[in-house]
Amino acid sequence: MPARRLLLLLTLLLPGLGIFGSTSTVTLPETLLFVSTLDGSLHAVSKRTGSIKWTLKEDPVLQVPTHVEEPAFLPDPNDGSLYTLGSKNNEGLTKLPFTIPELVQASPCRSSDGILYMGKKQDIWYVIDLLTGEKQQTLSSAFADSLCPSTSLLYLGRTEYTITMYDTKTRELRWNATYFDYAASLPEDDVDYKMSHFVSNGDGLVVTVDSESGDVLWIQNYASPVVAFYVWQREGLRKVMHINVAVETLRYLTFMSGEVGRITKWKYPFPKETEAKSKLTPTLYVGKYSTSLYASPSMVHEGVAVVPRGSTLPLLEGPQTDGVTIGDKGECVITPSTDVKFDPGLKSKNKLNYLRNYWLLIGHHETPLSASTKMLERFPNNLPKHRENVIPADSEKKSFEEVINLVDQTSENAPTTVSRDVEEKPAHAPARPEAPVDSMLKDMATIILSTFLLIGWVAFIITYPLSMHQQQQLQHQQFQKELEKIQLLQQQQQQLPFHPPGDTAQDGELLDTSGPYSESSGTSSPSTSPRASNHSLCSGSSASKAGSSPSLEQDDGDEETSVVIVGKISFCPKDVLGHGAEGTIVYRGMFDNRDVAVKRILPECFSFADREVQLLRESDEHPNVIRYFCTEKDRQFQYIAIELCAATLQEYVEQKDFAHLGLEPITLLQQTTSGLAHLHSLNIVHRDLKPHNILISMPNAHGKIKAMISDFGLCKKLAVGRHSFSRRSGVPGTEGWIAPEMLSEDCKENPTYTVDIFSAGCVFYYVISEGSHPFGKSLQRQANILLGACSLDCLHPEKHEDVIARELIEKMIAMDPQKRPSAKHVLKHPFFWSLEKQLQFFQDVSDRIEKESLDGPIVKQLERGGRAVVKMDWRENITVPLQTDLRKFRTYKGGSVRDLLRAMRNKKHHYRELPAEVRETLGSLPDDFVCYFTSRFPHLLAHTYRAMELCSHERLFQPYYFHEPPEPQPPVTPDAL
């Protein structure tokens, strides 16, 4: 069970009754009690006096949706347990057999009803000043923030568990929650710990009692429900047990123990004693924090109203508390029942499926049964299993529905409940005698079955000779057709535009190959029919105009190979390069003695093929867009001849032995972006950019390869003056690479070309990380995209190249489409700069700000946040020879970005005058020189580039920044004057 969050710290009252010695002037962690509350506070309080020393405020323990869907999930802030309300069987409240941390550990997993579970676990360390509670440092896998060091430090670990449920049927987010927990060891039976803590549900009232004498040590109210207590040991925090009781019960017991405000003795038995178990009843408390519901186990006495199991709305008023409860001001009050009604207006506003029962009583419910849930098809091996609620490992073939319904063990007198989906049968049930009616029905069924069998045999004997005769006639007709085909090929063999070398094929060879080929005509180009054989061959433009050019097979002398020829296009059906959507097949073929790829398209996709051809004709003038050659048609298919490529980007990245032939990843991404910018300049949105649709060309005459964008089947041509397209025709693209605005119902504006930028950003990370995706594994990607849950962990936060890449990719995959750069902006980014251009940029910036005032906007922007860029003092992070040389001529400020750039410029200008030792440490110009500084200050280039955007319009910086040209204004006519 994962460690629970640290909530409220209990203060100790009544110093005369304290069990500790005198207060020390030095606060040691062993003298503190740590109390964690639902609102995210961690209070450090004195064990003896109960006074709060300090409070650490963090995010709430639970973060759940504000709406309630069906079924509703109620988490337990104490340990992350889950309860459901409003299931299909209307069972009321039920307890699920797993917690949020366990689900995160088991994810990714999928339920039998189509729910995808995605989990995320993130750890963070807080370094706390023990005296003040101030955070000195925050450590995580992504960042590390620090303040001034302190001598007394406390290290607290906190874990964030995030679980997301995505419904594949409705394509909607089902539920998500975040649960926080502090790292602590589990509670133990510690004889040295002499205190018992009683916590009220629904508020922050805590009563701390001496567990041996029964003396009440102190009472404190923390204004938020308490979820955990901790003490400090040498190895860290250790959780301390506490008892959740009803507010009425706690106030009732304290009232019975003495005068208000002067409680001296706890007269009620402790839960450890058997007497207490008979007087306190376990229940489940349903509470409301902020706008969300939660559930927590609670003990109540006989006077507290409890909602019966399976009910959500009481039919009669509950019983009143026998004793008198005490209000905050000391007056006697009757604790009112509390209920909440969900606003029906939210149902139409948010389009949610609300609960069948709109009323849910907030208060104490009878302990619910454990759910026979279909959340998981099977428990993964890494999910902690309990013997009483999991199918044994040797029965994997059984479905999850066969798991017996779980019965809550907290109430000994609770009746055994059978699942509504699965009926339990006794192990040795006596056999039921067979009724006469059942026997008669069986006899009638036997007679009917025998009659049908007899009729079937008679029909078979009569029809078999006739069917054999028809089959022989059909075979004879097929034989005649094959002979006609051979004669046609022999007559027209000299007219074929493509004739492989070798002797003329023999009749028998063609006959042998045509049989099996015609059988596979569903996935290959068909043979010429007798009707098509009467037409003469057409080629070139005439074939396209006629629209019915016949396709012919020609044998090249190999028994297993045949060639299909349609106009100027020819290909071998057995040489398949790949398969596309809607039955499209890509073959290796020939066009005008050139190797090409031939796409064979089905008739139902002809309109899409025509649009693709039109877009290819418009866009193939760019070297990084696939080249189009020709299109042909026959009676059944359409064929498109395009440039033949060597591989896809996926093979380039994932095949370690792939020959890159000098095509570096950054160059490949630059070429891809250049092709995308060309498409966007033609108002073409690709809408399906992914590694499979980015191809690697065949080596040219110089042995070089390049990247090209292909597959224009889902492209959209925007009309002149339009910058967006409608989503009414569906959601194009491949799952896991689709921009969030394409699927989000909250997006009111139509998508634009930025959907391609989002996909390109994912491709960038895929290439740089050598196969990873910024939104996780394939099963989780689209759900994470909708949630904006990305991770760029493969990019090192202190490596210059990775810092530049992160800065660009984060912009490209931004959730807000308007924050994404255009393709031309991306091409101007420093990610694509050579080392020489980086050094030139630093020099130009230094020249520009040399005479700029320190109070000027440019210098202020450059120095804002600059101390982190130069690591507080850049002079201490360079080599000693360079430090010594810099001190000879002028004074530089170690905390100034401006002075660092000035030093780089001066040493570059006077490089040949530098001492040999300094030149050796700086390296050669320009590559080694600029790497010397960027390796020591990895954020320098990104920071300087962002700061100097103020001057991007100046002529000096035009090579480094992109500006959209102003839209042309309509000419002014004399009539308008």
From Swiss-Prot:
Pfam families: Pkinase, Ribonuc_2-5A. Changing residue 599 to A: Loss of autophosphorylation and of endoribonuclease activity. Inhibition of growth arrest. The keyword Protein biosynthesis does not apply. Its EC number is 2.7.11.1, 3.1.26.-. The modification Phosphoserine is found at residues 724, 729. It is found in: Endoplasmic reticulum membrane. Residues 513-552 have a biased composition (Low complexity). One of its GO terms (biological process) is response to endoplasmic reticulum stress. Residues 19-443 are lumenal. Changing residue 109 to S: No effect on dimerization. No effect on interaction with P4HB. GO terms for molecular function: ADP binding; ATP binding; enzyme binding; Hsp70 protein binding; Hsp90 protein binding; identical protein binding; magnesium ion binding; platelet-derived growth factor receptor binding. The chain crosses the membrane at residues 444-464. It catalyses: L-seryl-[protein] + ATP = O-phospho-L-seryl-[protein] + ADP + H(+); L-threonyl-[protein] + ATP = O-phospho-L-threonyl-[protein] + ADP + H(+). Changing residue 769 to F: In a glioblastoma multiforme sample; somatic mutation. InterPro entries: IRE1/2-like (IPR045133), KEN_dom (IPR010513), KEN_sf (IPR038357), Kinase-like_dom_sf (IPR011009), PQQ_b-propeller_rpt (IPR018391), Prot_kinase_dom (IPR000719), Quinoprotein_ADH-like_sf (IPR011047), Ser/Thr_kinase_AS (IPR008271). Glycans are attached at residue 176. Residues 410-434, 491-559 are annotated as: Disordered. Keywords: ADP-ribosylation, Apoptosis, ATP-binding, Disulfide bond, Endoplasmic reticulum, Glycoprotein, Hydrolase, Kinase, Magnesium, Membrane, Metal-binding, Multifunctional enzyme, Nucleotide-binding, Phosphoprotein, Serine/threonine-protein kinase, Signal, Transcription, Transcription regulation, Transferase, Transmembrane, Transmembrane helix, Unfolded protein response. Its main location: endoplasmic reticulum. Belongs to the protein kinase superfamily. Ser/Thr protein kinase family. Monomer. Homodimer; disulfide-linked; homodimerization takes place in response to endoplasmic reticulum stress and promotes activation of the kinase and endoribonuclease activities. Dimer formation is driven by hydrophobic interactions within the N-terminal luminal domains and stabilized by disulfide bridges. Interacts (via the luminal region) with DNAJB9/ERdj4; interaction takes place in unstressed cells and promotes recruitment of HSPA5/BiP. This is Serine/threonine-protein kinase/endoribonuclease IRE1. It comes from Homo sapiens (Human). The lineage of its organism: Eukaryota, Metazoa, Chordata, Craniata, Vertebrata.
